[in-house]
Amino acid sequence: MTNICDLADRKCKPCEGGVPPLRKEEAENLLKQLEQGWQLADNRISRTFSFKNYYQTMAFVNAVAWVSHQEDHHPDMMVGYNQCRVEYTTHAIGGLSENDFICAAKVDMLLIS
């Protein structure tokens, strides 16, 4: 069975459309491979991360930005003083792709010691 490390070790593949989004069952199976807290709704996955202060929140945001740049797959992020909500979807196909789960796993790895 694939786990978070397997997903985090993968690289995103360019997606410019022309392929169908993941079926709900496929997305649910990939969701099980992520850390707890990720939610599947409305053709996207999201998770809210909490921190002690603004500095830690912004350090996390910058780390997510680095991952996104490396993978060329970018989430929507809503940032507050001590929270950051990260949402992934693949806009080019109007739904979820494996890239969304790969990046979510990489984000999870940022916080695993």
Swiss-Prot record:
Q: InterPro entries from the xrefs?
A: PCD_sf, Pterin_deHydtase
Enzyme class comes to lyase
Q: Which keywords does the record carry? A: Lyase
Q: Name one Pfam family in it.
A: Pterin_4a
What's an example Gene Ontology biological process for this entry?
tetrahydrobiopterin biosynthetic process
Q: What does it catalyze?
A: (4aS,6R)-4a-hydroxy-L-erythro-5,6,7,8-tetrahydrobiopterin = (6R)-L-erythro-6,7-dihydrobiopterin + H2O
Instruction: Give an example GO molecular function.
Output: 4-alpha-hydroxytetrahydrobiopterin dehydratase activity
EC nos:
4.2.1.96
PANTHER family given for it? PTERIN-4-ALPHA-CARBINOLAMINE DEHYDRATASE
HAMAP family attached here? Pterin_4_alpha
Family to which this protein belongs: Belongs to the pterin-4-alpha-carbinolamine dehydratase family.
Q: What is this protein called?
A: Putative pterin-4-alpha-carbinolamine dehydratase
Lineage in the entry? Bacteria, Pseudomonadati, Pseudomonadota, Betaproteobacteria, Nitrosomonadales
